[in-house]
Amino acid sequence: MLQPKRTKFRKTHKGRNRGLANTGNEVSFGTFGLKATSRGQLTARQIEAARRAMTRHVKRQGKIWIRVFPDKPITEKPLEVRMGKGKGNVEYWVCPIQPGKVLYEMDGVPEALAREAFALAAAKLSVQTTFVIKTVM
């Protein structure tokens, strides 16, 4: 699963996830893409599950790019622990997602196959998505 090798700080503030994606909002590497249309956060497990679903459906032909990386630690306290006594331990990593962000890209496969693969991947994710095709200028 994806997570940073090392970070400057172990734990972060919760923060807010506002606005629209102004970087990573266009298909750059492949021909087809899966773009988020809603706001949320994707866990490293969700990103990996979607990647596996796509890879298996296209039978490892073509190329897949993952355009998101979970670099925000989420902490949790153990069950039945009283409030206070410091911030909990890092349990998993997430990537904050804003509407317009391209999550995955694919190339080297027919459009129909790419649509099917992205539909399988979208079912594994906690944000709404749409299928996009690279615009040629």
From Swiss-Prot:
GO cellular-component term (any): cytosolic large ribosomal subunit
Comp. bias intervals (Basic residues): 1-17
Pfam assignment, any one: Ribosomal_L16
Protein name listed in UniProt: Large ribosomal subunit protein uL16
GO terms, biological process: translation
Region of interest (Disordered), residue spans: 1-24
S-S bonds: none
Gene3D superfamilies for this protein: Ribosomal protein L10e/L16 (3.90.1170.10)
CDD domains to which the protein is assigned, alphabetical: Ribosomal_L16_L10e (cd01433)
Similarity comment: Belongs to the universal ribosomal protein uL16 family.
Stored PROSITE patterns: RIBOSOMAL_L16_1 (PS00586), RIBOSOMAL_L16_2 (PS00701)
